[in-house]
Amino acid sequence: MGPRGAASLPRGPGPRRLLLPVVLPLLLLLLLAPPGSGAGASRPPHLVFLLADDLGWNDVGFHGSRIRTPHLDALAAGGVLLDNYYTQPLCTPSRSQLLTGRYQIRTGLQHQIIWPCQPSCVPLDEKLLPQLLKEAGYTTHMVGKWHLGMYRKECLPTRRGFDTYFGYLLGSEDYYSHERCTLIDALNVTRCALDFRDGEEVATGYKNMYSTNIFTKRAIALITNHPPEKPLFLYLALQSVHEPLQVPEEYLKPYDFIQDKNRHHYAGMVSLMDEAVGNVTAALKSSGLWNNTVFIFSTDNGGQTLAGGNNWPLRGRKWSLWEGGVRGVGFVASPLLKQKGVKNRELIHISDWLPTLVKLARGHTNGTKPLDGFDVWKTISEGSPSPRIELLHNIDPNFVDSSPCPRNSMAPAKDDSSLPEYSAFNTSVHAAIRHGNWKLLTGYPGCGYWFPPPSQYNVSEIPSSDPPTKTLWLFDIDRDPEERHDLSREYPHIVTKLLSRLQFYHKHSVPVYFPAQDPRCDPKATGVWGPWM
């Protein structure tokens, strides 16, 4: 109201003045109320995402493993255990879908991983999760494994939305020396070099220090020094429990009963990782952040049985589209959950975290390309039905099995799509899709053995009876999570429907981007892996 209107007001005590004694105390109460005391009054939650590397389905106590994981078990028991949760079968694809909210067929990363000398990274026109959270007012930190490309500085974590970064850029390295050795084909030389960064600078002085301990210490420092009133996003991508199988001696002793050497060392690595998780959550509590924190734990893919991991009783392993390669170990722990101590059976995928976390942060996804992920917070927190009814595991026309079965009993076969009812999609292509309870696999999905836990059974693997020419499977995953009973002949109409869905995704996918090695990656001159273009 302008000055003229103000002058026309009555001079006596009007209704507004009479309300002041009532309204002012109410306003003070609202301002002084503790966070979370009323609907819409609390601050956006702190978000802590802890990603384990190569952790298998049967490698945690809450799935019945003999490996002791008391901290993970307690968090899962007091939170929401995700029992129908999926990742990708490999490192780079899972990490890219976590941070983009988009299937790898959208980014050209549907084939294998990004290798050290490939001039590749998550496309620079993709808007990543940390960028969206920064826009929502968050401080964003990353600690640990990047593995989303580093050939240009523009690909580095600090150029993709993270305020700080501490970790390694490639897919694996020595836990103590922090060096990675790689064959550079064009030069016919294997080069070993340091891969450790603090921000964009090379981080030295950490030799002979175990990486999980270093990363945990940095994460705790970030938590301890963080002002509670500022929303925090911490992405802690541990090296554990990816090979090489290295761990301090004291973590091996509790598992001397395990005779298999790989499994023995792997068990110790899992225990150390579990201890790290306990230390991080303890820091969140002692710093006063826990009561307003959403803590998410996830693996990036199934366990690698060749390096101590185990996915029993699920079929397959890392690199495969069988459940053992893609069914993820995961849970959410938080005082903010409306239901706790439950097992959630709703369908959730790693691409769902981006829209879920951005919504929790009260941000928006403006500027992103069309998302494949869904906001699943109500599904997790309240037990509501998942908005996701379909999940594309992958389509990779160039698939090469880098982790073949012993004696390699299966191999890519000829296309079965000559059959009229299967004409929608080339069934020789490595692909898999989930719709409701149904899962369809085509081509060669990867090693299809079942691998019992070492030292607990008299067999090291249980081969499949499938003929090597087979290129099509249909399973009811709800009733048959171990993928033992192929129903493709019994339900041809389901097969036809899912093949048409695969064809739809294939039609709307971008070409595979898997460039040849660039010899300019050679770190000989500097002794350090890093950007070269």
Curated annotation (Swiss-Prot):
Annotated Pfam families: Sulfatase (PF00884)
Annotated EC: 3.1.6.12
CDD domains for this protein: 4-S
Cofactor note text: Binds 1 Ca(2+) ion per subunit.
Active site per the UniProt annotation: C91 (nucleophile), H147
Any one GO cellular component localisation term in the record: cell surface
UniProt xrefs under SUPFAM superfamilies: Alkaline phosphatase-like
Description of how the protein assembles with itself and partners: Monomer.
Disease link: Mucopolysaccharidosis 6: A form of mucopolysaccharidosis, a group of lysosomal storage diseases characterized by defective degradation of glycosaminoglycans, resulting in their excessive accumulation and secretion. The diseases are progressive and often display a wide spectrum of clinical severity. MPS6 is an autosomal recessive form characterized by intracellular accumulation of dermatan sulfate. Clinical features can include abnormal growth, short stature, stiff joints, skeletal malformations, corneal clouding, hepatosplenomegaly, and cardiac abnormalities. Multiple sulfatase deficiency: A clinically and biochemically heterogeneous disorder caused by the simultaneous impairment of all sulfatases, due to defective post-translational modification and activation. It combines features of individual sulfatase deficiencies such as metachromatic leukodystrophy, mucopolysaccharidosis, chondrodysplasia punctata, hydrocephalus, ichthyosis, neurologic deterioration and developmental delay.
Protein's name in the database: Arylsulfatase B
Gene designation: ARSB
